[in-house]
From Swiss-Prot:
It comes from Staphylococcus aureus (strain Mu50 / ATCC 700699). One of its GO terms (biological process) is sodium ion transport. Mediates the transport of the dicarboxylates fumarate, malate, and succinate across the cytoplasmic membrane via a Na(+)-electrochemical gradient. Transports 2 Na(+) for each dicarboxylate. It is a multi-pass membrane protein. This is Sodium-dependent dicarboxylate transporter SdcS.
Length: 520
């Protein structure tokens, strides 16, 4: 257990150092300084020199704002969340929206869905339910190296559907490293050292990749999907329900996890090690250390099941009571959160209730503000006439094969998100794709859904996603290895996303991909 705690602490320090070491000496890096100046400069140049005849002044103004915000998001000239507050200042100044209209977007139902999801995830982490779930899954799947690898991927992927992918990977990596350490200590004379090293690398990458892939399973699994839900509602007035997305997302996760497991086990790090010395013993030992399920864990488990059932059945069961429009996914998320604040804990030395307001310190408020900023900007694009104008300009693409457009969008976003924030990428590109769908005459989800899914999938570089940074921080994998393996996982993801969006999603969501929707 000491080894487990030691490695968790070590990884946390490396993870933080990875993102902070370049910012110790100067307030801005060279790239940030360029972005800091370039953003307002593009804003001014657009206002002064860009005046198409068929674009009203308000549209030019919102385009200028968009270029400013996008530049600061990409370069992270200031914190992304701080940049996301710019619409509150700039949109009312241009008489695009009133202050009340802009501010209301930061309190959208979708933001409260994610807020409730965060609170539920923190409750799981506080009472260590996620560790028990992960270890139980690994223990059930089996003891061979192939099954241990699969077990870690399934456990991490499942957790990341409901808790942040960062938290899921941070929990699983120390367990994985402890198993590898045990294998080295118990190594038999006839055990191939190279095989253990290959298994070690495959396990570390498997955990990181599964944390990223699992987020595609539910709307609260990853920020780009919440942004997709919000932008789709904002531009077209239609909802993507929690239940229907799960029917699309979970099979996607299962297929991606399965193919990635096969690739890591039999192609990228092929080895002859069938059983890992001490592996299954250590898993059982850690389960024993957790002891019997505590009262607080049972409460959180019950609340988790209740939340899942309500999200899944809301659309189907509430229709007969004619209150579907009054009970949104965000309503359920906040109801569940309030229950967690009400129910008392037995272990009152640590916490009086299952969740208390100390949880506010752990909530990622910056992500919620980013969502609000994206929705406010989308509203401005729609109200100013910019969306309509963009649609007219993009009509030249009409006649291009929709599948070709989907392929280009998916691959472009997949590699763009390797070097930019996935939330910022989705927030920037989805409004453009909403307009493009009208111009080329296809259903908006045919373009928006693959972009949102691809924005979540970055496997090549440590800066691509927090899970990548964590596994790189373990010291077990080099950037070169991560890039070479991640490139092929990127391509695998692109193929699966394209197939799912083109052939599965229309059936599940009941949409005609060749039928465009009018912009609001």
């Amino acid at each position: 257990m000491a080894y487990f705690n030691q490695h968790q602490s070590m990884i946390s320090k490396r993870y933080l150092t990875f993102f902070s070491k370049s910012k110790k000496k100067k307030p801005f890096s060279a790239g940030q300084l360029i972005g800091l100046i370039l953003g307002p400069l593009l804003f001014l140049l657009t206002l002064l020199f860009f005046h198409p005849q068929d674009l009203p002044w308000k549209g030019v103004y919102v385009l200028a704002i968009t270029l400013w915000i996008a530049t600061w998001w990409i370069t992270e000239a200031i914190p992304i969340a701080a940049t996301s507050l710019l619409p509150i200042v700039l949109l009312p100044l241009g008489h695009i929206l009133t202050p009340e209209q802009v501010s209301s977007e930061y309190g959208n139902d979708i933001i409260f869905l994610f807020l409730g999801g965060f609170i539920l995830a923190i409750a799981m982490e506080r009472w260590n339910l996620h560790t028990r779930v992960a270890l139980t899954i690994i223990n059930l799947i089996g003891a061979s190296t192939s099954k241990i690898l699969l077990g870690f991927m399934v456990a991490t992927g499942f957790l990341s559907m409901f808790v942040s992918n960062t938290a899921a990977v941070m929990i699983m990596i120390p367990i994985g490293l402890a198993i590898i350490k045990e294998a080295h200590d118990l190594q038999e004379a006839n055990t191939n050292q190279t095989s253990i090293q290959k298994f070690e690398k495959s396990l570390v990458l498997a955990i990181g990749y599964a944390g990223t892939i699992g987020g595609l399973g539910t709307l609260i699994g990853t920020p780009p999907l919440i942004i997709l839900k919000g932008q789709y509602m904002q531009h077209f007035g239609h909802e993507i329900s929690f239940a229907k997305w799960m029917i699309v997302g979970i099979p996607t996760v299962i297929v991606l996890l399965g193919i990635t497991w096969l690739y890591l086990r039999y192609v990228a790090f092929r080895h002859d090690l069938k059983y890992l010395p001490g592996g299954q013993t250590l898993i059982k030992q850690k389960l024993d250390e957790l002891g019997k399920m505590k009262y607080e864990e049972k409460v959180v488990q019950t609340i988790f099941v209740l939340a899942s059932l309500l999200w899944i059945t809301r659309e189907f069961l509430l229709k007969k009571w004619e209150v579907t429009s009054s009970v949104a996914d965000g309503t359920i998320a906040i109801f569940i959160s309030i229950l967690l604040f009400i129910i008392p804990a037995k272990n009152t030395e640590k916490h009086r209730r299952i969740i208390d307001w100390e949880v506010a310190k752990e909530l990622p408020w910056g992500v919620l503000i980013l969502f609000g900023g994206g929705l406010a900007l989308a509203k401005g694009i729609s109200e100013s006439g910019l969306a309509k104008w963009l649609g007219e300009q993009l009509k030249s693409l009409n006649g291009v094969s929709p599948i070709l457009i989907v392929i280009v969008i998916t691959i472009f976003v997949l590699f763009l998100t390797e070097v930019t924030s996935n939330t910022a990428t989705a927030t920037m590109i989805l409004p453009i794709l909403a307009t493009l769908s009208v111009a080329v005459g296809v259903h908006p989800l045919l373009l928006m859904a693959p972009a949102a899914m691809a924005a979540n999938c970055a496997y090549m570089l440590p800066v691509g996603t927090p899970p990548n940074a964590i596994i790189f921080g373990s010291g077990k994998i080099s950037i070169k290895q991560m890039a070479s393996v991640g490139f092929w996982v990127n391509l695998i993801s692109a193929i699966i996303i394209i197939l799912v969006v083109y052939y599965v999603m229309p059936i599940v969501l009941g949409i005609d991909i060749n039928q465009p929707l009018p912009l609001k």
